[in-house]
Amino acid sequence: MTRISREMMKELLSVYFIMGSNNTKADPVTVVQKALKGGATLYQFREKGGDALTGEARIKFAEKAQAACREAGVPFIVNDDVELALNLKADGIHIGQEDANAKEVRAAIGDMILGVSAHTMSEVKQAEEDGADYVGLGPIYPTETKKDTRAVQGVSLIEAVRRQGISIPIVGIGGITIDNAAPVIQAGADGVSMISAISQAEDPESAARKFREEIQTYKTGR
């Protein structure tokens, strides 16, 4: 296994769907399947917060979501659980600034995809130095899904990172909908991530498809 190329990573970040069982009222596995069918390019298993599954139920959901990803040919990323990621032979892991040390995680996971959330220029540079394949920058917009988020910062950090000539793949995180995704890509991000914009949509497949079409248009047009 070799590390993913930056070009491939930038493509995969286009429509980055993140979801746990508690982010939808529908059957979570079905929602993941529909999002993938609609065109999600990457999926992150994020089972956190109130009503989150634990123990065997959590592992079973992860396995089913991973199977859906395999069937769709979409990489399966685990949020902040190196042990689970390694046990499942996931395609990658995503960690926040309050989670494990990125350099140590890189050493533990080998060539798997490593994503790191960053909120400042120094955190972006540190993530790149530590071996991150991409950074998640945000929160771009206000969000209800994550209760522990930092101050909303819009697209200013994305623009600043690109102005400095830093080419690490970037995905925008936080409060992104089909109506406000364009500025994120125009600022220099390679994709957008979303939870509720797909997980709580009446038709997750259609919602994912709209994101895929819009993001491709924005990326082509800049």
Swiss-Prot record:
UniProt key word Magnesium: yes
Cofactor field: Mg(2+)
Any single Gene Ontology cellular-component annotation: cytoplasm
Catalysed reaction equations from the record: 2-[(2R,5Z)-2-carboxy-4-methylthiazol-5(2H)-ylidene]ethyl phosphate + 4-amino-2-methyl-5-(diphosphooxymethyl)pyrimidine + 2 H(+) = thiamine phosphate + CO2 + diphosphate; 2-(2-carboxy-4-methylthiazol-5-yl)ethyl phosphate + 4-amino-2-methyl-5-(diphosphooxymethyl)pyrimidine + 2 H(+) = thiamine phosphate + CO2 + diphosphate; 4-methyl-5-(2-phosphooxyethyl)-thiazole + 4-amino-2-methyl-5-(diphosphooxymethyl)pyrimidine + H(+) = thiamine phosphate + diphosphate
TM spans (from-to): none
Gene Ontology biological process terms from the UniProt entry: thiamine biosynthetic process; thiamine diphosphate biosynthetic process
Positions annotated to bind 4-amino-2-methyl-5-(diphosphooxymethyl)pyrimidine: 44-48, 79, 117, 146
Enzyme class per UniProt: transferase
This enzyme's EC code(s): 2.5.1.3
Superkingdom of source: Bacteria
Cofactor binding summary note: Binds 1 Mg(2+) ion per subunit.
Pathway annotation from the record: Cofactor biosynthesis; thiamine diphosphate biosynthesis; thiamine phosphate from 4-amino-2-methyl-5-diphosphomethylpyrimidine and 4-methyl-5-(2-phosphoethyl)-thiazole: step 1/1
Function statement: Condenses 4-methyl-5-(beta-hydroxyethyl)thiazole monophosphate (THZ-P) and 2-methyl-4-amino-5-hydroxymethyl pyrimidine pyrophosphate (HMP-PP) to form thiamine monophosphate (TMP). Is also able to use the 2-methoxy analog MeO-HMP-PP, as substrate in vitro, but not the 2-trifluoromethyl analog CF(3)-HMP-PP.
Remaining remarks: Thiamine phosphate synthase appears to proceed with a dissociative mechanism (SN1 like) in which the pyrimidine pyrophosphate dissociates to give a reactive pyrimidine intermediate which is then trapped by the thiazole moiety.
Oligomer and partners: Monomer.
Listed name of the protein: Thiamine-phosphate synthase
